[in-house]
Amino acid sequence: SGRVRLIMKRADLNKIKTGEILVANFTMPDYVPAMKKAAGIITDDGGITSHAAIISRELGKPCVTGTKFATQVLQNGDLVEIDGEKGIVKIIKGK
């Protein structure tokens, strides 16, 4: 679990703090330093062969891809729990 950090543009990558949950439309190679800091990753797009899923597996971090609208529902500071095995994101406490 961790606090949400929305990454809506590249400039947001510098805002992520260690232990936050990176939430983005998708990830790309330049997201990897931020992904290393994150406790987990959630993306709107993608699947088991997406960049986010592959890098998350390599880093041993929980990841849920293909949520369709996580970036619209979640807000910076929300406390969430990720179950990467089942593909479930639970909002524990809103901002």
Task: Identify the role of each PLM range.
Residues 4-11, 15, 19-20, 25-27, ...:
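Acidic, glycine-rich flexible loop/linker segments
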